[in-house]
């Protein structure tokens, strides 16, 4: 079944990407106004919710590669928003935590970010949101399966 000249699945992808772009732009507004980048936000958010973490644990939790985590942590450290502590038992391991200043600066940004996302979803019922999550999860898993052979070439 074609929709104009765009296949239905491709059209659905375009709709999804446009919505994602709009919500992402909205959600980034308070982050950028606070002088933070998206990577900075991800690192601060995981530290807020999970507490102090080793640098190598942060990346997988926030979908950032190790280099991006290091750059973000360095930037946040220079701003006084995080502290870094080397492990006594293994000097290669550095644990990162939010400082009081980091918590004071980040909490209002996080609250604004969360409120904007909530407003973006206000016309979506809880049932529709659950259905959307289920469908997106299904699509994501299928796409991962389809890309597995390409990864092993």
Mark where each language-model region is.
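The alpha-helix within a helix-turn-helix
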Residues: 59
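Short alpha-helical elements of helix-turn-helix
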Residues: 10-14, 34-45, 67
